[in-house]
Swiss-Prot record:
Keywords: ATP-binding, Ligase, Nucleotide-binding, One-carbon metabolism
InterPro entries: Formate_THF_ligase, Formate_THF_ligase_CS, P-loop_NTPase
Pathway assignment: One-carbon metabolism; tetrahydrofolate interconversion
Record-level GO BP terms: tetrahydrofolate interconversion
Signal peptide bounds: none
Similarity comment text for this entry: Belongs to the formate--tetrahydrofolate ligase family.
Protein name: Formate--tetrahydrofolate ligase 2
The reaction(s) this protein catalyses: (6S)-5,6,7,8-tetrahydrofolate + formate + ATP = (6R)-10-formyltetrahydrofolate + ADP + phosphate
Gene Ontology MF annotations: ATP binding; formate-tetrahydrofolate ligase activity
Binding-site positions, ATP: T69, P70, L71, G72, E73, G74, K75, T76
EC number annotated for this UniProt entry: 6.3.4.3
Length: 576
């Protein structure tokens, strides 16, 4: 038996359709809607939203997961595999995923195109530059930073308090040495010295805005609302105040258009925006979904990390803006992650899996399945039916899959074993059929007066503090919330400033339902600790900080960048 092909080798061996043909399969017109970037990538003009508005809406499916290990559990791969699977049962699907950040691609996480025989291609285009959207976000963000420092240098007419400036600079590289810096050093003509730093581009509020804007006009308005600090009287100062928002909108004029690609089996893939999953929504763009919802029988999108993180924000932030209501959600689970949630194993990024983790042990799977059950409940809290996708690995045992099925059944969820990594769409047909049946069953129940109807977890009128406590209690399973004094002052200030009607995006670890990454399973009897609260007013949410959040990653001892190169024919090698 030969050595297994790498993701890059599989992707490179694919026969791709011309991007115009992919667009036509969605009902997009080449001359009006598509702006090709080479043979296999195109931008989609936003006029498609209006042009397609009379077409039937697709069924809207979210792909989420259990609380992941540092290795990830395969949401993107499942999203791609599921999209391909629908064509095997005579249905059309479009998928919508986030755009990759180059920092993690050269770090330890690798790319974001899926894997095996369920990938978006060309995968090296997706993982490296694509159409330059991340560079546009970087440029727009840093343009505002330059405008702020220029305003300080030329007299500071707005009376900005330099120590209050929260707008740092960004770049799409993992570089820990830039987390904290001093700028403006040198001669008097070199600027006003102050402490600042760099974040990774995915953590920029501009990226969050790109993901949530529903039109070019909405993008411009949101950019103007960005709060960069406050003046000497404590009043917020915006990007509009420093006259930077217009230039930012110009830089992002093309970036707001979603990118069209395809999967290995020719399923259309809208790839757009990549906000951080910790301090932002972790979802792909609203405009991609507004286009995709009119192009197929099913639109499948994903949300970052576990259902407590990306899915909760998808429901309560993204869906409020888009006006779209999901018909079902997938919860991706793996045997290895559920064993880890038993608390008996430790999985570390970049390290080999513990030998004992690969041994047959359905009891440990059942012990860790408390996390799965809680994440299914988190989906159902919003009136959305859930289906569990067991992302199967060759080291799994049938008894372990049966344990997952039993746990899912306890909380009323169907379950499907998926092998889309090795089999492509054929390997996720069971999941596609389970979703089709679940959606039809829910619609029948609804017509009879039962069944689930989509609902938000909280109304926008609810005070910020109460919103935080509702999410902590209902979604995370906390018994209460503890606030640092600084966090309470910030909440009071945001309410006074008129930001109290914004939704809340809790920034916490993705490795636990709690704010402590070491607590596995579905912990009880703990309290969420909120140490500070920040506002992304332009993006349109408040984000409390729970625990330590890194917004500029560092490289590992042996990052992927060490293995990435060009071969003698100019082809990329080592990307995964």
């Amino acid at each position: 038996m030969g050595e297994a092909l790498s993701n890059l080798e599989i992707a490179r061996g694919a026969k791709l359709l011309p991007i115009e043909e992919v667009g036509r399969s969605m009902g997009l017109r080449e001359e009006r809607h598509l702006e090709p970037y080479g043979r296999h990538v195109a931008k989609v003009d936003l006029c498609a939203i209006e042009d397609l508005s009379e077409r039937p809406k697709a069924k809207y499916i979210l792909v989420s997961a259990i609380t992941p290990t540092p290795l990830g559990e395969g949401k993107t791969t499942t999203t791609v595999g599921l999209g391909q699977a629908f064509s095997h049962i005579g249905k059309r699907a479009t998928i919508a995923i986030r755009q990759a950040s180059m920092g993690p691609a050269f770090g330890i996480k690798g790319g974001a195109a899926g894997g095996g025989y369920s990938q978006v291609v060309p995968m090296e285009r997706l993982n490296l530059h694509l159409t330059g959207d991340l560079h546009a976000v970087t440029e727009a963000h840093n343009m505002l930073a330059a405008m702020i420092d220029n305003h300080l240098y030329h007299g500071n007419g707005l009376g900005i308090e330099p120590h209050s400036i929260s707008w740092r600079r960004v770049m799409d590289v993992n570089d820990r040495s830039l987390r904290n810096i001093v700028i403006g050093l040198g001669a008097r003509t070199d600027g006003v010295p102050r402490q600042s730093g760099f974040d990774i581009t995915a953590a920029s509020e501009v990226m969050a805005i790109l993901a949530l804007a529903s039109s070019l006009e909405d993008l411009r308005e949101r950019l103007g609302r960005i709060v960069i600090g406050h003046d000497r009287e404590g009043n917020p100062v915006s990007a509009e105040d420093v006259r930077g928002a217009g230039a930012m909108a110009v830089i992002l004029k093309e970036a707001i258009k979603p990118n069209l690609m395809q999967t290995l089996e020719g399923t259309p893939a809208l790839v757009h925006a990549g906000p951080f999953g910790n301090i932002a929504t972790g979802n792909s763009s609203v405009v991609a979904d507004l286009i995709g919802i009119r192009t197929a029988d099913y639109l499948i999108t994903e949300a970052g990390f576990g259902a407590d993180m990306g899915a909760e924000r998808f429901f309560n932030i993204k869906c409020r803006i888009s006006g779209l209501e999901p018909d079902a959600a997938v919860v991706v689970a793996t045997v290895r992650a559920l064993k880890a949630h038993s608390g008996r194993y430790q999985i570390k990024a970049g390290a080999p899996l513990p030998e004992e983790l690969l041994e047959e042990n359905p009891q440990d799977v059942l012990a860790g399945a408390e996390n799965l059950k809680k994440q299914i409940e988190n989906i159902k809290l919003h009136g959305v039916p859930a289906v569990v996708a067991i992302n199967a690995f060759p080291t799994d045992h049938p008894s372990e899959h049966k344990a997952i099925e039993e746990a899912a059944k306890e909380v009323g969820a169907r379950c499907a074993v998926c092998r889309h990594f090795t089999e492509g769409g054929k390997g996720a047909v069971e999941l596609a059929r389970a979703l089709e049946e679940t959606i039809e069953e829910n619609e029948r129940e609804r017509r009879r007066g039962g069944g689930g109807s989509f609902r938000f977890l909280y109304p926008l009128e609810m005070p910020l503090k109460q919103k935080i406590e509702t999410i902590a209690r209902e979604v995370y399973g906390a018994e209460g919330v503890e606030y640092d004094a600084e966090a309470l002052r910030a909440l009071e200030g945001f309410e006074r400033a008129g930001f109290g009607r914004l939704p809340v995006c809790l920034a916490k670890t993705h490795l636990s339902l709690s704010s402590d990454p070491a607590l596995k399973g579905a912990p009880r009897g703990w309290k969420l600790s909120v140490r500070e609260v920040r506002a992304s007013v332009g993006a349109g949410f408040i984000y409390p900080i729970c625990g330590q959040m890194r917004t500029m990653p560092g490289l590992s001892a042996h990052p992927a960048a060490e293995r990435i190169d060009l071969d003698g024919e100019g082809n990329v090698v080592g990307l995964f």
